[in-house]
């Protein structure tokens, strides 16, 4: 069950023209990467990537949430404010997915890499696609009270305006979306892949022209 945070102006922090709403960070590149990274001599790009990911996850565990950011877990990594279309999935989204995978696997890094589903030829039950969607494409959404609100395309910031982007995941129009879930015996069971939604925080306007940050529903999984 999700608990709504108080409706207050969300902080925007980041570098350049790419930021996450409500993202709070601690430390800098030196403290996150560690003093001995340059001399460790990792042998491959895969090892380097895994090493950086693990250090970021370790740093995240060290940071203890204070009373001021007790609602930080309600902020979604699927919302981004940017002057242009993001070229990659959100970093926090990748970290969360990777952390969930590590927790589930609970094995050494090298064993995890060789047991990756892609290496074993495993397929998901339902095929899905993910992409960045603009507020102009969404136009409207449903908030936590069930009311339809207008999703604002641009968010004012000290140096101008940034566009709102949403990283949505939905069932693929091809494959097993209509034929049923992969791996289910169709002779005995009926199944269907459906797109499910979650709440993210976005700048919106209600039917009374009141602008504010609200939790709205977007497509997040299949």
Curated annotation (Swiss-Prot):
Keyword Secreted: yes
Compartments (UniProt record): Secreted
Principal cellular location given in the protein's record: secreted
Pfam families listed in its UniProt record: NGF
Keywords: Cleavage on pair of basic residues, Disulfide bond, Glycoprotein, Growth factor, Secreted, Signal
Function according to Swiss-Prot or TrEMBL: Promotes the survival of neuronal populations that are all located either in the central nervous system or directly connected to it.
Name this polypeptide is given: Neurotrophic factor BDNF precursor form
